[in-house]
Amino acid sequence: MKGGADEMDDSKARGRGDTQARARTTRPQPDTQPETQPDTQTPARARAQDVEVRELRTLGEFRDVEHLYGGIWPPVPGQGPPVGIELLRAFAHAGNYVAGAYRDGVLVGAAVAFFGAPIGETLHSHVTGALTGSGVGFALKTHQREWALARGLRRITWTYDPLVRRNAHFNLAKLGARPVEYLPNFYGDMVDTVNSGDASDRVLVVWELNDPRVRAAVRREWMPIEPPADAVSALTVRDGWPVVGDTRADVVLVAVPADIEAMRRTDPEAARSWRAAAREVLGGLLDEGATVLGFDREAGYLVSRGWVG
């Protein structure tokens, strides 16, 4: 996966806001009724595919997370990782969510979240980083959900880069989260080697913890929505570049590039064009109150103007 719940199984999750990415491993230093309690099938120390997820509390553990994040989002000289040891310590000490995922005693992923508004209802997941293609992001997200439910919370929110295809698929198709707001240049200029040179547009998603499709998703039973045959292409790909189509139809598809991160390095002009097009089309649709129903790896976002639910 790449990453930050901008991954969740953001698998090559990279980028700030809950995303995930490829990183080097770090060995730990020694030092439907609404659910209000964790599922009995998912213990507090969640395990998935030989991954153990648990809360982190020591400076040695926080140092490992800082190292992991530095590998996922390599900083430029003079800059640090998205969350450093001091903030990790402060978040954990204040009762927020700081957790690590381990495989064979090696830290392979970590997530940081804090309580948000409305108070008593919401957890905001700020950063999630994990190794690529290993199921770590899903294990972290299910653990985070159980942690939130045990504290009486109703939802988890996070942001992600809407142009990163694997993140969109993970967040929408695998977790059942719903985009609710388009946030242009949310973090301002970002100077890590993954996001540098591009506006930091993000989409805010809401994960309603007791939504039937979310409960089915964490059991791996939910089937994502298939694009209907009459869906109109509002944004398509032509020779690697974005082409804006009809955005006025009731049901539209919004495409994304195959690999925006690689495009930023090889063709920054095309990457900037994609950013502008996504802001215009997807951002415009969300601003008008349209609903993102899901995400298809090939077709992109499935968006409806008339869906209510």
Listing of model-derived features with the role each one plays in the protein:
Residues 115-125, 247-254:
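A conserved beta-turn-beta hairpin within the catalytic core of GNAT-like acetyltransferases
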Residues 1-32, 36-46, 151, 164, ...:
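Intrinsically disordered, low-complexity, positively biased terminal segments
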Residues 104-106, 117-120, 165, 297:
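Short strand-connecting beta-turns/loops that link adjacent beta-strands
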